[in-house]
Amino acid sequence: GMAQHPQVIGAMVDVAARMGTGAGGTRNIAGTNHPLVELERELADLHGKEAALLFTSGYVSNQTGIPTIAKLLPNCLILSDALNHNSMIEGVRQAGCEKQVWRHNDVAHLEELLKAADPERPKLIIFESLYSMDGDIAPIHAICDLADKYGAMTYVDEVHAVGMYGPRGGGVTERDGAADRVDVIEGTLAKA
């Protein structure tokens, strides 16, 4: 793989010589560094977003990102696709708010749940763009149409699609021209 490519190894050696091999602690303790900030800018640009935030893994980003967003929205209702990854399910558990599970990629069922919810209640729809276990691709535009109609936020896990889909590798949201419609795009630097 790319981890053994001579140019990748050379770039790593160069950066290690200039910057060191680690911060010695997490960002909140040891601070940040210029290459990390630059990488976040590049990732935000890749997805057409205002900003990006790096985590230690895709699992951790879902596990902490979902509950953080939900806790910022008082009385949030999370609507989760039935086949979401365990990291997303764990994030929903940690959010501690009400959740409803919609049948996999079934936008009619999702709409039933949205229609039954209090229109004033904050809602977060979470789903994957490309499901790893069966290769299904989410109907992103249809989900975003429902989010617009019912005033919900959208959170898509692009872990299995980043680097593989879209002209710049931004994932299924980029390929389908939907990145600007999704509120939060979660990805990884390790899968594709």
Please state what every model-predicted region is.
Residues A23, I78, K99, T154-Y155:
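Hydrophobic beta-strand scaffold residues
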